[in-house]
Design a protein with these regions (language model features):
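Positively charged, low-complexity intrinsically disordered regions
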Residues: 56-59, 138, 252
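Assembly/oligomerization scaffold segments
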Residues: 1-117, 121, 125, 129, ...
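Short, conserved helix/loop micro-motifs enriched in His/Cys and acidic residues
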Residues: 134-151
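Acidic, small/polar-enriched beta strand-loop surface segments
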Residues: 1-3, 115-116, 158-165, 170-306
């Protein structure tokens, strides 16, 4: 427990809009370190020689006597800042990354027991291959039945991303450090609960800043999807091309069993991305300036895909 030493915490977790894939979550934790105890090269430190890379770190917030996990991962780097002057304090910044780093560092080839199976079963088979703990998984059954694993040399994260694209679902590390695999129907059908509503009208939850964007970042009007062993399935929207020029996107070697499934995925991508969209990039909250009890909860209780 090092809360009393912490001066700043920054957490970044989310999905890349261009690739439609979740990326590794990161966190920077800055500590006051006037004694040098958090300098990993200091032999006089009470923690020496145990300040090494990949030590586990858990970041949580407490509200109304309940703990809310914000990040669970591993310390990647210890950055020490030696500051001089009457008003300066030496600090150490712990640069952290979530379990995606471990998945990306675990090489696999043949996946045991991975014949024709549901996408969720394939996720579990890949995680079994690298001995990922059962207690750190939250895996949907999935809505697609996949081909047998190709058995190529790759890392576990690449294999999981292939399943994610084949399912047309989502896979990420949640704030508790669990691998979450969400099926495509769950992505569409499952509403977030509880619902937090934001407004600037003096009702609901107030915010200090909301960044709204309207651009072509997500625009794709020509889509080609190719399954492993299949032929490219292409769909396009000519009115969108005429209006916004050509924006092409491709996926290859997904593991669905038929060309019809690949075509259905291409049609789904085109339907949702052929036109520019208005989106909220960020909402900034000041958790101390409002009596609405849902405001702090909105700051600590919202998970990815909520």
């Amino acid at each position: 427990e090092i809360t009393d030493l912490v001066t700043r915490v920054a957490i970044r977790r989310g999905r890349n809009r261009l690739t439609s894939q979740f990326e590794a979550g990161t966190a920077n934790v800055t500590l006051y370190d006037q004694t040098g105890d958090w300098n990993p090269t200091n032999p006089a430190s009470i923690y020496y020689p145990n300040l090494v890379p990949l030590r586990q770190i858990i970041i949580y917030a407490t509200y109304n006597s309940q703990d809310y996990f914000l990040f669970s991962g591993f310390i990647n780097t210890y950055d020490t800042g030696f500051r001089q002057g009457n008003d300066e304090l030496s600090t150490v910044t712990l640069k952290c990354v979530d379990g995606f780093k471990l998945l990306a560092g675990s090489g696999i080839a043949t996946v045991t027991g991975s014949g024709v199976q549901t996408s969720g079963a394939r996720v579990n088979a890949i995680l079994d291959e690298i001995e990922w703990p059962l207690s750190l998984r939250n895996v949907d059954t999935g809505d697609s039945t996949l081909q047998a694993d190709p058995g190529t040399d790759r890392d576990a994260l690449q294999a999981l991303f292939n399943v994610e694209q084949s399912e047309f679902g989502g896979i990420f590390l949640d704030a508790n450090g669990k691998v979450d695999f969400v099926s495509r129907n769950a992505l569409i059908a499952t509403p977030a609960f509880p619902v937090y509503e934001f407004s600037d009208q003096g009702v609901d939850i107030s915010y200090t800043n909301a960044v709204v964007a309207f651009d072509d970042t997500n625009l794709v009007n020509d889509v080609s999807i190719t399954r492993l062993g299949g032929t490219p399935q292409n769909v396009f929207d000519q009115p969108s091309i005429d209006k916004f020029f050509l924006h092409s996107g491709q996926r290859s070697d997904i593991l669905v069993q038929t060309n019809a499934e690949a075509l259905s995925q291409a049609q789904g991508i085109l339907a949702t991305r052929k036109d520019p969209e208005v989106r909220i990039d960020s909402i900034q909250l000041n958790l101390y300036d409002d009596v609405n009890p849902n405001k702090p909860l909105a700051g600590v209780d919202i998970e990815l895909l909520d």
